[in-house]
UniProtKB/Swiss-Prot annotation:
GO BP terms: translation
Official protein name in the record: Large ribosomal subunit protein bL31
A GO molecular-function descriptor: rRNA binding
Natural source organism: Laribacter hongkongensis (strain HLHK9)
InterPro entries tied to this protein: Ribosomal_bL28/bL31-like_sf (IPR034704), Ribosomal_bL31 (IPR002150), Ribosomal_bL31_A (IPR027491), Ribosomal_bL31_sf (IPR042105)
Alphabetical list of PANTHER family matching this protein: 50S RIBOSOMAL PROTEIN L31, CHLOROPLASTIC, LARGE RIBOSOMAL SUBUNIT PROTEIN BL31A
Family from the record: Belongs to the bacterial ribosomal protein bL31 family. Type A subfamily.
Requisite cofactors: Zn(2+)
Record's function text: Binds the 23S rRNA.
Quaternary structure and interacting proteins, as annotated: Part of the 50S ribosomal subunit.
Amino acid sequence: MKANIHPDYTDLKVTCSCGNAFTTKSTMSKDAFHIEVCSECHPFYTGKQKVVDTAGRIDKFKQKFGKFSRG
């Protein structure tokens, strides 16, 4: 392998807008990185995920455009 061709692999402090912070390794040239959503505040991980009821919307679509179906 060639020497001195790879970027430095350093610690990177990641901070979320919710206040959660953690450290990881990265080749980024920055010391810190800011994100908007993390596993502490994302609805999928917190259990506050909304389920969208699309059944009514699909029926409405079929009613409106069903006459144009190929089958």
